[in-house]
Curated annotation (Swiss-Prot):
It is an enzyme of class 6 (ligase). L-tyrosine binds at residues 34, 169, 173. The keyword RNA-binding applies. The gene is tyrS1. ATP binds at residue 233. Homodimer. One of its GO terms (cellular component) is cytosol. Residues 352-418 form the S4 RNA-binding domain. Keywords: Aminoacyl-tRNA synthetase, ATP-binding, Cytoplasm, Ligase, Nucleotide-binding, Protein biosynthesis, RNA-binding. This is Tyrosine--tRNA ligase 1. The lineage of its organism: Bacteria, Bacillati, Bacillota, Bacilli, Bacillales. Its EC number is 6.1.1.1. Belongs to the class-I aminoacyl-tRNA synthetase family. TyrS type 1 subfamily. A motif ('KMSKS' region) lies at residues 230-234.
Length: 418
């Protein structure tokens, strides 16, 4: 099965130019393709995963991806999908973000020791030295104003306002494609569905600049959720690929909590499981949804892909401990991950009567309530129910000397830090 057939099965093709011509080219030779990533933060998030994994899919199929980091365009700002003007970052900030994103991209693509190595590029290398006269004469003259105004990325902003800076973004991205076509023989650009206007503008620039040009564009669908909420966002904010911003446990939990209505689609979109494996999981969703086999497979595949096998094992261990209440088995680093968002309090490492600890740490509102909670068996210290009113929390209750985990009731956790 060819790469395009696989993408069709996975629902990963939104729009494409000259489908027949692209299929023939991909069957005939190893094709260079690119996708751009503007450095708007110091980490990619899961909203970037589809295009990143598309580059990986093409590389696994024998083609040569170019990961383009927008060190130049990142200083301008892409108006696509935005309702208002972006805040411009400083040159130093963009340079820092660029390096961070380049490091992350290297985790997903093979840049050496393969027959079809990926390439990393930074469009600041050619946009940074472009003078205004050359830009207007050699590139700008190829873009009619009516043509640009008709593009969705621009038209959607005309009422709210768009600066010349962001208006010119389409021309700069088009020039990226032309530059990569001329200097790297890059024949295909891929991007999100909101990039269709920019991609077709680039193809038009190539057509006007090069005789007998053969270049192609392909967009991937917008990832949606059945409940109508935005994909990739939680109450805590974006789901980042950087483990310092989103822990592997949080990352794993994001995928594990996928709705039954979305899980098969996400298995197709994001994983490298075979068609047969996905169809089998789809069957399990229909026949035994309570087992959540598809969600577990999705969580495992994605966490392993982004954070590695060891981080996946930790995430599974933390999840199991929180579900069963056996939290004493967790290490200090696992507690940091799993209890990142629970209420916590700093205390000195000294022996304390449990009743006093509950009140002083605001776990129970009063001594009377604390005594009731303990007597009724509602208080757990490191997963163990504690009903003795004179129980003293000592060194033995401090996991690695750093934490004591208090649970009140079935699921209300509190973390004591030392």
């Amino acid at each position: 099965m060819g790469i395009l057939q696989d993408l069709e099965f996975r629902g990963l093709i939104n729009q494409q130019t000259d489908a027949e011509g692209l299929e023939q080219l991909l069957e005939k030779e190893s094709v260079k393709l690119y996708c751009g990533f503007d450095p708007t933060a110091d980490s990619l998030h899961i909203g970037h995963m589809l295009p990143v994994l598309m580059l990986r899919r093409f590389q696994l199929a024998g083609h040569q991806p170019i990961a383009l980091v927008g060190g130049g365009t990142g200083m301008i700002g892409d108006p696509s999908g935005k309702k208002a003007e972006r805040t411009l970052n400083t040159k130093d900030t963009v340079a820092y973000y660029t390096e961070s994103i380049k490091n992350q991209l290297s985790n997903f693509l093979e840049f050496e020791n393969v027959e079809n190595p990926a390439t990393m590029a930074n469009n600041y290398d050619w946009l940074g030295n472009l003078d205004v006269i050359s830009f207007l004469r050699d590139i700008g003259k190829n873009f009619g104003l009516n043509y640009m105004l008709a593009k969705d990325t621009v038209a959607s902003r005309l009422e709210t306002g768009i600066s010349f800076t962001e208006f010119s973004y389409m021309i700069l991205q088009s020039y990226d494609f032309l530059n990569l076509y001329q200097h790297h023989n890059c024949r295909l650009q891929i991007g999100g569905s909101d990039q269709w206007g920019n991609i077709t503008a680039g193809l038009e620039l190539i057509r006007k600049s090069e005789e007998d040009a053969k270049a192609f564009g392909l967009t991937i669908p917008l990832v949606t959720k059945s409940d109508g909420t935005k994909f990739g966002k939680t109450e805590g904010g974006a789901i980042w690929l950087d483990p310092e911003k989103t822990t592997p446990y949080e990352f794993y939990q994001f995928w594990i909590n996928t709705d039954d209505r979305d899980v098969v689609k996400y298995l197709k979109y994001f994983t490298f499981l075979s068609h047969e494996e996905i169809l089998e999981l789809e069957k399990q969703v229909a026949e035994a949804p309570e087992k959540r086999a598809a969600q577990k497979a999705l969580g495992a595949e994605m966490t392993k892909l982004v954070h590695g096998e060891e981080a996946l094992e930790q995430a599974i261990k933390i999840s199991a401990a929180l579900f069963s209440g056996s939290v004493a088995e967790l290490t200090a680093s696992e507690i940091e991950q799993g209890f990142k968002d629970v209420p916590s309090v700093e205390r000195t490492a000294e022996d304390t009567v449990l009743i006093d600890l509950l009140v002083e740490s605001k776990i129970s509102p009063s001594k009377r309530q604390a005594r009731e909670d303990v007597t009724n068996g509602a208080i757990y210290v490191n997963g163990e129910r504690t009903q003795a009113l004179d129980y003293v929390v000592t060194e033995k209750d401090r996991i690695e000397g750093k934490f004591t985990i208090i649970r009140r009731g079935k699921k209300k956790y509190f973390l004591i830090r030392y």
